[in-house]
From Swiss-Prot:
It is a lipid-anchor. Residues 70-95 have a biased composition (Polar residues). This is Uncharacterized lipoprotein SE_1947. Keywords: Cell membrane, Lipoprotein, Membrane, Palmitate, Signal. The keyword Signal applies. It comes from the Bacteria.
Length: 215
């Protein structure tokens, strides 16, 4: 009888031990599963963070590339504008800035070359008749443009009316409210005894007073 009880007790203890072992194994499996899920979730989270970081970096790279392209485009545009601005401009009369610069240089060259005022050979007293000058000629000439330059400007102005081949005849000086001015006469070869009268002030501005003067 005692042996039977002892056997029953041992069997009962074995069953309890097996039950506890099963519970421990099940608990261990649950813990392992939770750990794997946690690791998997963490890995997915890290992957999402990396993906998001890559997207951000790509956006920044795209913005930098776009900014570089815009900067390059602006530089090219500015360079084109600069090249355009360096080209000779043309005014409404079709005269380029280069030609104007050459004309100004020619005027300056003539001013640097002093030529004493003179009458033409066998000149008729026309300008001297219209404007006889009795003042200080040296003082007046100091206030007026170079004679050769003034004569060239006045002749070009005279040739704009009637014949374009007028010849220089004579000159005089006339006193005005603001100083002095030249008075030139140019003979018109297409008309008998006809002269063009042109004045030129201190600023070098010509004025045709009479394109068909007959003394």
């Amino acid at each position: 009888m005692k042996k039977v009880l002892a056997s029953a007790t041992i069997l009962s203890l074995m069953l309890v031990g097996c039950s506890n072992g099963g519970n421990d194994e099940s608990s261990h499996k649950d813990d392992s599963s939770k750990t794997e899920q946690k690791d998997k979730s963490s890995s997915q989270h890290d992957s999402k963070k990396d993906s998001k970081r890559n997207d951000t970096n790509n956006k920044q790279d795209n913005q930098e590339n776009k900014s570089n392209k815009e900067q390059t485009s602006n530089q090219n545009s500015n360079a084109g504008e600069q090249r355009t601005s360096e080209r000779p401009t043309t005014n409404s009369n079709g005269i380029s800035s280069d030609n104007q610069n050459k004309q100004q240089q020619s005027v300056q060259d003539n001013q640097n070359k002093y030529v004493a005022p003179y009458q033409s050979e066998n000149a008729t007293r026309v300008a001297r008749y219209l404007s006889p000058f009795e003042g200080d000629r040296s003082q007046a000439l100091q206030q007026l443009p170079n004679f050769e330059t003034a004569l060239s400007i006045a002749k070009n102005e005279a040739n704009m009316y009637g014949s374009e081949n007028k010849s220089y005849n004579d000159y005089s000086i006339e006193q005005t409210e603001d100083g002095f001015r030249y008075v030139f006469s140019f003979k018109d070869p297409s008309k008998s005894n006809t002269y063009s009268i042109v004045t030129l002030n201190r600023q070098g501005q010509p004025t045709v007073v009479d394109p068909n003067f007959q003394p």
